[in-house]
């Protein structure tokens, strides 16, 4: 073997060999238990960053481990390839989105392959390929046929200069367009939705079926779904036949209503506004509706409102209360109206004070019966109902039920469960997305494109100006088609789908990625699903994971898959952070190349810099390019550092010194095998007659097997597993019994245990030992419990609780024998001398403590 570890040569060699061997191909043999390991697939930006590397290396270790443990493993990869960046590239660089995307995919695929990932590339999916989005469209039609896809008017971000719709991420923090700089307006457009609210209860309850998910992620999803149990109440409008419907979780406070608030967009707003208030109300509406939803609902956003002049009637006591509109009430949430109970709601209390609205107490603590108390803050706890008519004196918990019962009997309310979750708006007025496969006919209405006409392909002869309507909406040759139902002239839908649609089912496609006849066959999808281990960033904890769960339940109900949940276990890896230098006075970030780390100062001003770790990003100049790390150290070192530096769920702080440390460790493994090769000679010695050195080494080998297996089979503590590899390497260095079968066992075990972490060097050294079969095809080492047993143990000798020394004793010694060995030892005799031993405390396997008297 070569005397020097050459990572670059070894890694190129084995990556090519593995491809030729088909080592990473998914086996068809279903006699073995299946294991589906999956990383969240990337957007093809063109370059891997360290966050990608961490994600994919974690999954790769799991996939390699499971193969060695006897599973047939599915470990695929693909590309979440539709989206705005490609369309922006078309506008800015004059390159077609498809060309830009596929160039990036080729570049990133090569980078992934250089990491030595054991991916089955024959199952690669690309969401912008017609071969994939044909089935995205087919699945959309499954939703449509089930009544789960529909159109309605909805507010969008509108750029008045470019005359186009903007995604939320294209609107800056000041509510301006990313491109034109114009103040973004809110505009109503007819949009497509998926009825995820029909599955709200299932999505909430089935979180209990996911013990392998982090609790924080399940809590985030539960909060997003936002189940509320309360009442639906109707407030008549003075002088009108119509009523304002509100939802409340505190019906017990209804006698404390002193105003009602409508969303500015509510259809009743213009009707309840008096002529006197019309001008002011319209001005207020224009100001409010120009703001994005994010701006209006921000925690620190002042809650503003204005009187409409209209009044509503509290149906419980007949009192008239003013109707206002306010910026914090959104028409898309709940009923688009709320009842104001300032005495018992923190937000309402502040709003009432600012708008000089009355505050009426209707709940008081049990130990306080004063009904005329003046509040300095809202009382939001349970208590006793007061100022509440016939409900006075009732505890508020009981009062909730009583109020609802009364409202139901009187016909102006009922019990209701409401969810914060809203239906999923999937329309995008963009080009680079999956076309929505419907046709609008003047006679037949909305008609689905027939299955045999799928996919509806994106036209290529389009112009990308970034202004006006979507490029699709301007292309008459593509829009105008005959109606599939009646044959008369009709028009295609010009909206494309939210890219979250593409990523909501890709894990199903991987199970049957090359099927041209269907999205996935029932046999194959049921064979592989659910995903056993899903790995990705916590930033996807809500939307992507929730939408994927929703999709899975819908296709289950359509008879396309048998599972309830897509992902059995979820690992959300922490961020990769880089050393960051920032001038605290100017807020300017300084590239590390311009800073002396021993004395960090601004190179321009000489001012001291703040130094801290922060998520890697270009704008902060704190990123580390994976290509540079691979070029200097190789993929195996990069993998080892990523796995060793921090537990997978924690943030990882990049440290060049620790990278160097892992490189030194792999060089050490290289030397261990080299020295073994140089000094080992065949021996007929049996394991039965082992020396103490051999016994100690064999114990170290099986401790490593035990600890590493537990680390990987449990909570994926890769960092402690790498530590165990280091301990085993130290044991081999110390033992030096090269001709012993135990040493051979140790070297081979080290390489097999190392293989999932550093696959290239493990493979090279395995073959150096004379093996012809891949190290990755070896069975995972099995623990021999007898190897952990020891002949002798170290016994601590204490006098009056103070340690005076240690002795070696047989591990099988009884309590009485331990006392005898301890008393007769030189250590005890020297310290006890002529002292009288009053008591002896024996802790078997650990210590003997002598209590003496004067």
UniProtKB/Swiss-Prot annotation:
- Broadest EC class? ligase
Keywords tagged on the record: Aminoacyl-tRNA synthetase, ATP-binding, Cytoplasm, Ligase, Nucleotide-binding, Protein biosynthesis
Query: The organism sits in which domain of life?
Result: Bacteria
Q: Does the keyword Ligase apply?
A: yes
Biological process (GO), any one:
leucyl-tRNA aminoacylation
User: Which residue numbers does the motif 'HIGH' region cover?
Assistant: 42-52
Catalytic activity, as annotated: tRNA(Leu) + L-leucine + ATP = L-leucyl-tRNA(Leu) + AMP + diphosphate
Q: Which residues form a coiled coil?
A: none
Q: Which NCBIfam families match?
A: leuS_bact
Q: Output this protein's name.
A: Leucine--tRNA ligase
Q: What is the lineage of its organism?
A: Bacteria, Bacillati, Cyanobacteriota, Cyanophyceae, Oscillatoriophycideae
């Amino acid at each position: 073997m070569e005397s020097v570890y050459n990572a670059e040569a070894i890694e190129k060699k084995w990556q090519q060999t593995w491809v030729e061997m088909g080592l990473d191909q998914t086996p068809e043999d279903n006699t073995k238990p299946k294991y589906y390991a999956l990383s969240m697939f990337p957007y093809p930006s063109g370059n891997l960053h360290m966050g990608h590397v961490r994600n994919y290396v974690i999954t790769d270790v799991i996939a390699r481990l499971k193969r060695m443990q006897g599973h047939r493993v599915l470990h695929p990869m693909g590309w979440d390839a539709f989206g705005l960046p490609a369309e922006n590239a078309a506008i800015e660089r004059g390159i077609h989105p498809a060309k830009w995307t596929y160039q990036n995919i080729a570049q990133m695929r090569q980078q992934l392959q250089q990491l030595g990932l054991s991916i089955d590339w024959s199952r690669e999916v690309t969401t912008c390929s017609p071969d994939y989005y044909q089935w995205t469209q087919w699945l959309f039609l499954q939703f449509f046929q089930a009544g789960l896809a529909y159109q309605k008017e909805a507010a969008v971000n509108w750029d008045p200069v470019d005359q186009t719709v903007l995604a939320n991420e294209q609107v800056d923090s000041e509510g301006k367009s990313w491109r034109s700089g114009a103040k973004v307006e809110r505009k109503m457009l007819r949009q497509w939705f998926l009825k995820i609210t029909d599955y709200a209860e299932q999505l909430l309850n089935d979180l209990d079926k996911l013990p392998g998910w982090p609790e924080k992620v399940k809590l985030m999803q539960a909060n997003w779904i936002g189940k509320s149990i309360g009442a639906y109440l109707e407030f008549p409008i003075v002088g009108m036949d119509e009523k304002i419907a509100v939802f409340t979780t505190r019906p017990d406070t209804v006698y404390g209503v002193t105003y009602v608030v409508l969303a500015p967009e509510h259809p009743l707003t213009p009707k309840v506004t008096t002529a006197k208030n019309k001008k002011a109300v319209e001005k207020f509406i224009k100001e409010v509706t120009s703001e994005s939803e994010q701006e209006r609902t921000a925690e620190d956003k002042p809650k503003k409102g204005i009187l409409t002049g209209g009044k509503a009637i509290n149906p419980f006591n007949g009192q008239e209360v003013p109707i206002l509109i306010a910026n914090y009430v959104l028409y898309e949430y709940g009923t688009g109206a709320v009842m104001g109970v300032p005495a018992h709601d923190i937000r309402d209390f502040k709003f009432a004070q600012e708008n000089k609205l009355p505050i009426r107490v209707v709940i008081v603590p049990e130990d306080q019966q004063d009904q005329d108390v003046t509040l300095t803050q809202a009382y939001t706890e349970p208590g006793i109902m007061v100022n509440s008519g016939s409900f006075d004196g009732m505890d508020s918990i009981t009062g909730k039920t009583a109020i609802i019962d009364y409202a139901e009997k009187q016909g102006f309310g009922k019990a209701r469960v409401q969810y914060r979750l809203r239906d999923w708006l999937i329309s995008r007025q963009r080009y680079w997305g999956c076309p929505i496969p419907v046709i609008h006919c003047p006679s037949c209405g909305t008609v689905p494109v027939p299955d045999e006409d799928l996919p509806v392909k994106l036209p290529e002869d389009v112009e990308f100006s970034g202004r006006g309507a979507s490029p699709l909406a301007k292309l008459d040759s593509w829009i105008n088609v005959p109606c599939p139902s009646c044959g008369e002239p009709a028009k295609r839908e010009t909206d494309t789908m939210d890219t979250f649609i593409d990523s909501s089912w890709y894990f199903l496609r991987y199970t049957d990625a090359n099927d041209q006849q269907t999205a996935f066959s029932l046999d194959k999808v049921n064979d592989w699903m659910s995903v056993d281990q899903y790995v990705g960033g916590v930033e996807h904890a809500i939307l992507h994971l929730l939408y994927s769960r929703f999709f899975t339940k819908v296709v289950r109900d359509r008879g396309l898959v048998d599972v309830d949940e897509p992902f059995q276990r979820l690992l959300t890896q922490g961020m990769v952070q880089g050393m960051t230098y920032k001038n605290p006075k100017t807020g300017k970030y300084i590239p590390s190349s311009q800073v002396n780390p021993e004395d960090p100062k601004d190179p321009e001003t000489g001012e001291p810099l703040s130094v801290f770790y922060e998520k890697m990003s270009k704008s902060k100049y704190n990123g580390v390019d994976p290509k540079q790390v691979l070029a200097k150290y190789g993929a195996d070192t990069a993998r080892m550092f990523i796995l060793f530096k921090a537990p997978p769920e924690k943030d990882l702080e990049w440290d060049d010194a620790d990278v160097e440390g892992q490189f030194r460790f792999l060089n050490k493994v290289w030397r261990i095998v080299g020295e073994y090769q140089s000094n080992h000679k065949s021996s007929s010695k049996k394991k039965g007659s082992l020396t103490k050195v051999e016994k100690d080494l064999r114990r170290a080998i099986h401790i490593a097997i035990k600890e590493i297996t537990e680390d990987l089979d449990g909570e994926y503590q890769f960092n402690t597993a790498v530590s165990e590899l280091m301990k085993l390497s130290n044991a081999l260095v110390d033992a030096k019994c090269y001709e012993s079968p135990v040493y051979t066992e140790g070297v081979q075990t080290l390489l097999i245990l190392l293989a999932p972490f550093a696959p290239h060097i493990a493979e090279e050294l395995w073959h150096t030992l004379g093996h012809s079969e891949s190290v990755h095809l070896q069975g995972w080492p099995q623990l021999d419990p007898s190897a952990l047993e020891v002949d002798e143990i170290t016994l601590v000798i204490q006098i009056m609780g103070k340690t005076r020394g240690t002795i070696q004793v047989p591990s099988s010694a009884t309590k009485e024998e331990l006392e005898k060995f301890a008393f007769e030892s030189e250590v005890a005799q020297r310290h006890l001398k002529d002292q009288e031993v009053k008591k002896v405390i024996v802790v078997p396997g650990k210590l003997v403590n002598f209590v003496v008297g004067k």
